[in-house]
């Protein structure tokens, strides 16, 4: 972490967000995924856990290192992965059981931010409330994908880090140099209008889903619809229960009245 006096002041009333993905992918050993030599016989799957940018964009300009704390039965169970521009933070292993993985994020020195901790549950088998949800976890090549969309929020970042985060979005793989020689630079191309191409150094989210990219504005809209439908169902259930309660209260009042009338008649 850089000395605070070199980072400038905090940019007040400012929040910068950066989307990223935390997840794991597992695949059972088979003819198409043979068990490597030297792997114990009781290991049933190969798997990897990762932290990466949305649509595989580079996140090493704000994240420099990730620590993965695996199950203690795994040799060298605390793995430190240094950032390489353009590559995800990944650990690959084999095993037979599911467990919680502790993930610690270390930000670039210019951020002045302390590390933060996340948790991810390694899934080797599909899960869900029904078969449809379970099958949705299995990709076409038989992999079990357990991914979650996350957003890193930097609240009132230091000026140096704020300038780094907001230096401008660029297309993936774009280089400022236009050719050999000094002074030959080029400006980035026009910003995309369809929003289905995610640029580097941005908080962009693709407009539509595609293979290997389950998170998009389309996904968000589908989740909002599900929540709206669930809210509507909950409201209908509440109305039905209230109507039943009202009917039972009226029935109770009628029975009380009949009992009082019968008691009065018996006395007279």
Curated annotation (Swiss-Prot):
Disulphide bridges: none
The keyword Signal is annotated on this UniProt entry: no
Residue span(s) of domain YEATS: 10-168
GO term, biological process aspect, one: chromatin organization
The entry's keywords: Activator, Chromatin regulator, Coiled coil, Cytoplasm, DNA damage, DNA repair, Nucleus, Transcription, Transcription regulation
Localization: Cytoplasm; Nucleus
Entry coiled-coil feature ranges: 220-268
Segments crossing the lipid bilayer: none
GO cellular component: chromatin; cytoplasm; nucleus
A matching Pfam family: YEATS
Region described as Disordered: spans on this chain: 173-194
Domain of life: Eukaryota
Family: Belongs to the YAF9 family.
Functional note: Component of the SWR1 complex which mediates the ATP-dependent exchange of histone H2A for the H2A variant HZT1 leading to transcriptional regulation of selected genes by chromatin remodeling. Component of the NuA4 histone acetyltransferase complex which is involved in transcriptional activation of selected genes principally by acetylation of nucleosomal histones H4 and H2A. The NuA4 complex is also involved in DNA repair. Yaf9 may also be required for viability in conditions in which the structural integrity of the spindle is compromised.
Domain writeup: The coiled-coil domain is required for assembly into the NuA4 complex.
Subunit organization: Component of the SWR1 chromatin-remodeling complex and of the NuA4 histone acetyltransferase complex.
UniProt protein name: Protein AF-9 homolog
Organism, scientific name: Gibberella zeae (strain ATCC MYA-4620 / CBS 123657 / FGSC 9075 / NRRL 31084 / PH-1) (Wheat head blight fungus)
